[in-house]
């Protein structure tokens, strides 16, 4: 039997699942217009577009070393906003966190 090694430059099914868990609600609410995948020998990337914009705004990439990077594009160019050795780590900036609630005793003391 021949076993073919999975390329470090490609997203795994788990990586895609992590990404689409974040993307689907944003697309359903109309915040994101679409996601396009581009694959090459140098890496795999998902490009996120916003409604009424003709260019991608976010890029989630896995390079040939297996490193994940999340990029944001403003009018000045691409800026890294996250990176990690796993997709979960890299995408953590988009994970919702529970709101911080100040205990009632501290609120009263502040006044």
Please tell me what each predicted stretch does.
Residues 1-52, 107-111:
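Negatively charged, low-complexity tracts enriched in Asp/Glu with abundant Ser/Thr
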Residues 35-39, 60, 71-73, 84:
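Assembly/interface hotspot detector across virion components, adhesins/toxins, and nucleic-acid enzymes
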Residues 53-79:
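Short aromatic-glycine-(Arg/Gly/Cys) micro-motifs in beta-strand/loop hairpins
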Residues 1-11, 72-111:
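Mixed-charge, Lys/Arg-enriched low-complexity segments
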Residues 47-48, 54, 71, 92:
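Compositionally biased amphipathic helical and low-complexity segments enriched in hydrophobic
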Residues 28, 32, 41, 64, ...:
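Intrinsically disordered, low-complexity segments enriched in small/polar residues
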